[in-house]
């Protein structure tokens, strides 16, 4: 189980987007794409075969390394560490993620 998954709310702790809070759009190996974070300008050449591609300069999100983001705890409104523990329900134990500062569970059971 990974510490950061798609849909998690994270805060950027290093880089040009430091302090930005956003949702993780996708996870790529050891990098994450954060909504509205680490914006780059991409130059697109016009393509006559695709009418929707008119070309120009487009702003889009670039991946950030996992070490440059941390989970954002909405209760404490700060970056937080994530731990793992096993919870038992109906005789079946399940591994869940939780915030270490206040023991609040991140995953749904």
UniProtKB/Swiss-Prot annotation:
Molecular function via GO: rRNA binding; structural constituent of ribosome
Gene encoding the protein: rplX
Biological processes annotated in GO: translation
Protein source organism: Legionella pneumophila subsp. pneumophila (strain Philadelphia 1 / ATCC 33152 / DSM 7513)
Disulfide bridge positions per record: none
Family membership: Belongs to the universal ribosomal protein uL24 family.
Alphabetically ordered keywords of this record: Ribonucleoprotein, Ribosomal protein, RNA-binding, rRNA-binding
Subunit structure: Part of the 50S ribosomal subunit.
InterPro entries hit by this protein: KOW (IPR005824), Rib_uL2_dom2 (IPR014722), Ribosomal_uL24 (IPR003256), Ribosomal_uL24_CS (IPR005825), Ribosomal_uL24_KOW (IPR041988), Translation_prot_SH3-like_sf (IPR008991)
GO CC terms in record: ribonucleoprotein complex; ribosome
Role according to the record: One of two assembly initiator proteins, it binds directly to the 5'-end of the 23S rRNA, where it nucleates assembly of the 50S subunit.
Pfam families given in the database record: KOW (PF00467), ribosomal_L24 (PF17136)
Protein's name in the database: Large ribosomal subunit protein uL24
